[in-house]
């Protein structure tokens, strides 16, 4: 059974995540004190029910040791996973302005901007040990819920999930990435007028890139690097490995290479997911 701990900065989508988990059959509790986690888990273990609990600045333990002790006291039947939701500062400010809600730390006479920064510092101990960090800056409510359903329901228990995501550097580096590879030095299909409207998912773009030796070398060396360290990552009790591939716009080279890497590791029996940030953004 899974004990999903949902944390993150206020305004990043924790309530949406908790509702999505409830729809998936999790027993959900909002803002349960950390010290009560073992008691809740023992009660649900008897009923064989997975649980999801949100933790934010309102119920953060006074020290990281309290959280670690609570995790140690969980029943063996439960596999704890920590999901941390985040968004960039400007997005959080906009969301609070749109909803006109009060930030949890604003009561301490802090401005909204200062409250967001203070909260980030307070939550860093949880963020640093998260199994999965999700950047919701570019996501709608429905996209976040669907992404969680895909990643969590499609995940085999206790097995590392490899996530390959393409992005464009002009849109910023994904904050949920464990590894970032820059492919802007590779031949660019953008300069071919016939290929420019296409994406790395289209066969003509794939054929263009496939003709270049340096593209093959990059894919080979990148997958070799990941294969070298993957056994250690798998034994490090982590649930996700997110590999971000970036080109200028996130439309051609990064998409193609992310798909090539995803296909390779999928063919080796790994649990693999792929995501294309720029292409998903264009659909909205």
UniProtKB/Swiss-Prot annotation:
Keywords: ATP-binding, GTP-binding, Nucleotide-binding, RNA-binding. One of its GO terms (molecular function) is RNA binding. This is RNase adapter protein RapZ. It comes from the Bacteria. The lineage of its organism: Bacteria, Pseudomonadati, Pseudomonadota, Gammaproteobacteria, Enterobacterales. HAMAP family: RapZ_like (MF_00636). Disulfide bonds: none annotated. ATP binds at residues 8-15. Coiled coil: none annotated. InterPro entries: P-loop_NTPase, RapZ-like, RapZ-like_N, RapZ_C. Homotrimer. Modulates the synthesis of GlmS, by affecting the processing and stability of the regulatory small RNA GlmZ. When glucosamine-6-phosphate (GlcN6P) concentrations are high in the cell, RapZ binds GlmZ and targets it to cleavage by RNase E. Consequently, GlmZ is inactivated and unable to activate GlmS synthesis. Under low GlcN6P concentrations, RapZ is sequestered and inactivated by an other regulatory small RNA, GlmY, preventing GlmZ degradation and leading to synthesis of GlmS. Signal peptide: none annotated. GTP binds at residues 56-59. Belongs to the RapZ-like family. RapZ subfamily. Pfam families: PapZ_C, RapZ-like_N. Residues 266-284 are annotated as: RNA-binding. PANTHER family: RNASE ADAPTER PROTEIN RAPZ (PTHR30448:SF0).
